[in-house]
Amino acid sequence: MKQLILVSFLIVFNTNAEDQTNIDALLDGLHEDAHKGNFEAYFDRYSLDAVFLGTDKTERWNIQEFKSYAKPAFADGHGWTYEVIERNWEGSGDTYWFDEILFNEKLGHCRGTGVVQLINNEWKIKHYALTMLIPNSIAADIGTQTQQAE
């Protein structure tokens, strides 16, 4: 019985470690493809029914809408660049969720959050949301500016 429990634990641990490696590769590749302007490779990382949320309140796109939005940014061989500072994720089986702190020269620190799912033995991004990180000390001022801009 102890051996069965140990074997079960090792299988789960190994699977989780392998999943984590594959998910990190998926997300690292996403950011690398965006940086290099690899449109097809970038969007191949998303599921066919993926949703992307951008930083503006109007930016809720299905994958086809997101492709239309992003195409001009990728047209010159450059997409956008976000450096990964830190990443956390949770989950098991065929679904994981993550959050990552990113840095962009224009927007500063941002947070990407999302859900990935194993589809036909390949990890795909089902949902991704990008938000700007605002220090609490200036949040009220930013809130006022946001309301004025609307």
Describe the residue ranges of each PLM region.
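Sec-dependent N-terminal signal peptides
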Residues: 3-13
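Surface-exposed, charged secondary-structure patches
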Residues: 19-24, 67-109
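Short, well-ordered alpha-helical segments enriched in acidic and aromatic residues
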Residues: 37-49, 53
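A mature extracytoplasmic/lumenal domain signature
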Residues: 46, 56, 86-88, 101-104, ...
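A short gly/proline-enriched turn/hairpin at secondary-structure junctions
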Residues: 50-61, 72-78
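Short beta-strand segments and strand-loop junctions that repeat across beta-rich extracellular domains
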Residues: 113-122, 146-148
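Low-complexity, intrinsically disordered terminal/linker segments enriched in charged
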Residues: 127-150
